[in-house]
Amino acid sequence: VALAGPDMAIVAADHARDHARLRNVREAVFVREQQVPPELEQDALDPLCFHLLALDGEGRPVGTARLSPDRRIGRMAVLAPFRGRGIGEALLQALLVEARRRGWPEVSLHAQRHALAFYARAGFVPCGPPFQEAGIDHREMRRRLPGASAVEDAEAAAAVLLALAGHARRELGLYSRALDPGLLDRMDVLDALRRFATRPGERRVRVLLQDAASPQRSGAPLLPLAQRLPSVFAFREVRDPVDARYPSAYAFNDTGGALLRPLGHRFDGEGGVDDAPVARRLRLDFERVWERSRPCTEYRVL
């Protein structure tokens, strides 16, 4: 049992015993709200799945989720009046706990387009092209347990950055050629960095650049955010010619998350929130270069 709050519980459900309670929530969300045909909402996998119910303080079902034998998360549903209370996050985390207990190396899911950021914050990475399921736009997402998932494009790289910022305790590190246009100027990434930087307590975002002039000339939107929070953000530019030729770009946090793009001018690579060996290596490399690089005093507001 995992609690989502003082008046909410997440409990394992038995499909045969709890079928009606599971169906009531799922029909309300998928069939009536999202107009999914009833015959598509129920499938042959249902009796074989591990199911969860979210119960309110009076024991009434308000949310569902399931883990299928093909290692896929699905049927994530929370009744409309109960959204925004962390119930979806609690259901998802409980399924990840169960997947780890079973020793699964990876789980996947089909995310509706509007829910991509929700799953990204939990460490899921988009993969493959968008597709339609029951007439609704979806994209497949995966999460390694532990380890890194393949990153195929800018949306997947952004998803990893959202997760790194969301899981970080006190620190983020970014190594970039010139603030990665198409990635570090995305609104969802900027919002994630702002949320991290403005959380209570001491926070630090360190950014190493190979070219500090280009972001300033192009008006990179991360710079005004950093200038409003000078106690959090610090920028340095590499000086050593060897560092200037380093081909990769990467990010790491202080909880074992990492994103590594072998060719920094491309978005593809690997990343995840549970990749401690890579995160440690990247942090050590970052510290060495940081110490021999120059502070970007030109970024400060006069």
Residue spans for each PLM region:
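Short amphipathic alpha-helix that is part of the acyltransferase structural core
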Residues: 2-51, 55-60, 72
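Conserved active-site tyrosine of GNAT-family acetyltransferases
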Residues: 26, 119, 124
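Conserved GNAT-family N-acetyltransferase fold
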Residues: 52, 63-65, 76, 139
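Conserved acetyl-CoA binding element of GNAT-fold acetyltransferases
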Residues: 68-81
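Conserved acetyl-CoA pyrophosphate-binding loop and the N-cap/start of the following alpha-helix
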Residues: 82, 86-94
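Conserved GNAT acetyl-CoA-binding A-motif
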Residues: 99-112
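Conserved catalytic-core motifs of GNAT/GCN5-like acyltransferases
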Residues: 108-110, 125-140
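PLD/PLD-like phosphodiesterase catalytic module centered on the HKD motif
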Residues: 147-173, 177-302
